[in-house]
């Protein structure tokens, strides 16, 4: 999986934040929560999730260019909605060369997310 190349950078980005609990798909961390669509039975999981000391729950996803943009949009909308319910945000971590693609999708589909470069 290409995301494994960027997971350490993403973890160091999260660890700079004032966090209480960090969950990640990386080895040595508890896995983030998996959301399952009732209609399609598709599973959605963030690459990272963290809780701040105020109790807000944030989700982070490593945003890579993908031929299946619709699937990314659905995933990001679900994660954004779930983060908003817990007073948090969706953070899309875009490696160099992927930021413009990510920003275009976020803007075009009106996704409530913050795009960061890692």
Q: What is each model feature region?
A:
Residues 27, 61-66, 93-96:
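Structural motif
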Residues 1-7, 20-56:
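Active-site metal-binding core of divalent-cation-utilizing nuclease and nuclease-like domains
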Residues 46-79:
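Conserved catalytic cores of phosphodiester-cleaving nucleases, focusing on short active-site segments
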Residues 80-87:
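Arginine/glycine-rich "motif VI" loop of SF2 helicases in the C-terminal RecA-like domain
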Residues 93-118:
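Domain-level recognition of nuclease-like catalytic cores that cleave nucleotide substrates
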């Amino acid at each position: 999986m290409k995301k494994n190349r960027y997971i350490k950078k993403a973890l160091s980005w999260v660890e700079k934040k004032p966090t209480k609990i960090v969950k990640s798909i990386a080895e040595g961390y508890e896995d983030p929560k998996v959301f399952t669509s009732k209609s399609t039975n598709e599973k959605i999981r963030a690459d990272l999730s963290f809780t701040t000391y105020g109790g807000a729950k944030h989700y982070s996803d490593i945003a890579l260019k993908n031929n299946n943009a619709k699937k990314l949009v659905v995933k990001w909308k679900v994660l954004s909605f779930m983060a908003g319910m817990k007073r948090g945000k969706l953070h899309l971590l875009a490696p160099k060369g992927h930021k413009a693609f990510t920003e275009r999708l976020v803007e075009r589909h009106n996704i409530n997310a913050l795009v960061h470069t890692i």
